[in-house]
Regions:
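Conserved hydrolase catalytic core segment
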Residues: 95-135
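A catalytic-pocket lid/entrance helix-loop region that shapes and gates access to the active site
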Residues: 129-156
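Conserved HGGG/HGGXW glycine-rich cap/lid loop of the alpha/beta-hydrolase fold
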Residues: 17-68
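Alpha/beta-hydrolase fold catalytic core
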Residues: 1-30, 51-53, 94-95, 122, ...
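Catalytic histidine-centered segment of alpha/beta-hydrolase-like enzymes
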Residues: 258-267
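Conserved alpha/beta-hydrolase catalytic His-Asp/Glu region
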Residues: 152-207
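Conserved serine/cysteine hydrolase catalytic core
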Residues: 185-242, 254
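Active-site loop/oxyanion-hole signature of alpha/beta-hydrolase fold enzymes
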Residues: 44, 57-100, 272
Length: 279
């Protein structure tokens, strides 16, 4: 984890872990990961952006090194994640920021930019997420995220990740290994499993309309860039077209060779995000 620091803060009564890159810079990028992932997914992008920005990469409640919620029905939802984001920024003294969010992390940014962080998020990058999700893709994600498997070896866990996250696009072997090592935990019986609270998928049953955010979208008054995986089953082409036509009228760029969601790990993806944030 060269180039960043590992930190913890209590936000809304819950301990939240985050990594910080480029600590000497005044301008801040918040980079927030996807549903069943961790902030370490942002390492490659954060290392690139840290040459000119301070980058904060949280682990969402119930993921990675952050605390698991004792009230999963109430707290695994966008409204509580938005509260966590506000608390995190307030405690870090961040008055304004640029926001990069993959999947769920983008949905949090969308909600916050139209809500509690209106005026504080200056620019928003949504990585394969919009104000509406395709239901078959949600069911696909729930099928593996809601009942995480356990394996005897790290090699088996890595093979599992390579299968379910194949839509991320190109990752070198070293990055697959890092993805595995930074998103695993060992069970009491010694087996390894993905590093998150399986109860976080209750969001889809306890808050079934959480990801339907057209009202928030139409209220946005900031520049938005949407990266859509060419083969994404979550962000459909018609949704992306509607995002171009209404609300903040997003710029939409299709990322070739990816589904849900681009891994944010290639020079092309670095350049797209950097140019947008620097504009």
């Amino acid at each position: 984890m060269s180039g960043c620091t590992s930190n913890y803060l209590v936000c809304e009564g819950r301990e939240i872990h985050y990594t910080e890159w480029g600590a000497g810079h005044a301008e801040v990028v918040v980079a927030w990961h996807g549903l069943a992932r961790t902030g370490r997914d942002m390492d490659a992008m954060a290392a690139h952006l840290a040459t000119r920005w301070r980058v904060i990469c949280p682990d969402t409640l119930g993921r990675g090194l952050s605390q698991w919620s004792p009230e999963p029905g109430a707290e695994y939802c966008l409204a509580f994640y938005e509260k966590l984001a506000v608390s995190l920024l307030d405690q870090l003294g961040i008055a304004q920021c640029l926001w990069l969010g993959t999947s769920m992390g983008g949905a949090i940014g969308l909600k916050a930019a139209a809500g509690r962080l209106s005026g504080r998020i200056r620019r928003l990058v949504l990585n394969d997420i919009g104000p509406q999700l395709a239901e078959p893709a949600v069911q696909r994600i729930r099928s593996y995220a809601g009942s995480p498997p356990a394996f005897a070896t790290m090699a088996e866990l890595e093979a599992f990740f390579r299968t379910v996250y194949a839509p991320y696009g190109w990752l070198p072997d070293a990055q697959w290994r890092q993805l595995t090592e930074t998103s695993m935990r060992r069970l009491p019986d010694g087996r390894v499993t993905p590093h998150y609270d399986p109860a976080m998928v209750r969001q889809f049953t306890d808050h079934p309309d959480d990801y339907l955010q057209w009202d928030a979208w139409d209220a946005l008054a900031l520049p938005v860039l949407c990266l859509r995986g060419e083969h994404s089953d979550l962000l459909l082409p018609e949704t992306a077209e509607a995002m171009r036509a209404r609300g903040p009228r997003a710029a939409v760029v299709e990322i070739a060779g990816c589904g849900h969601a681009p891994a944010l790990n290639t020079p092309e993806q670095f350049a797209l995000v950097e140019r947008f944030f620097a504009a």
